[in-house]
Amino acid sequence: MAAGMKGKRSRRRKERKNVEHGCAHIKSTFNNSIVTITDSVGNTLSWASAGGLGFRGSRKSTPFAAQMAAETAAKAAMEHGLKSIEVYVKGPGSGREAAIRSLQAAGLEVTLIKDVTPIPHNGCRPPKRRRV
């Protein structure tokens, strides 16, 4: 091993992209919410999840956790010059509306809201019914 390279890792500096319009992909499941903000081509600008922000267990699936995740992702994306977004929502979770409201409150102009939840045409067998 080289003498001066012990314990140092080379990290590329994040370059600041200038993007005015992008897409926000909100995946809201029963257990977690993930918000990814991309440019119009699909390259990721920023992302955040409820679990990544420190929410654990049943608090991860709350609308407040989704709101905080969307707010964090929006602030990071606005550093790249983002002003308006199209929102694509996927999944049955409780954080869908809260995340959209949070993106608007962060100062992003929402131009489109589209539900892209995948619907099976009688595909996989669903999990068994819960008995409580």
UniProtKB/Swiss-Prot annotation:
Ribosomal protein is among the record's keywords: yes
Family of this protein: Belongs to the universal ribosomal protein uS11 family.
Molecular function GO terms recorded: rRNA binding; structural constituent of ribosome
Protein's name according to its UniProt entry: Small ribosomal subunit protein uS11
InterPro entries membership: Ribosomal_uS11 (IPR001971), Ribosomal_uS11_bac-type (IPR019981), Ribosomal_uS11_CS (IPR018102), Ribosomal_uS11_sf (IPR036967)
Region (Disordered): 1-20
Binding partners and assembly: Part of the 30S ribosomal subunit. Interacts with proteins S7 and S18. Binds to IF-3.
Gene Ontology biological process terms from the UniProt entry: translation
UniProt keyword annotation of Electron transport present: no
GO cellular component, one term: ribosome
Keywords: Ribonucleoprotein, Ribosomal protein, RNA-binding, rRNA-binding
SUPFAM superfamilies registered for this protein in UniProt: Translational machinery components
Biased composition (Basic residues): 1-16
Main function: Located on the platform of the 30S subunit, it bridges several disparate RNA helices of the 16S rRNA. Forms part of the Shine-Dalgarno cleft in the 70S ribosome.
Superkingdom: Bacteria
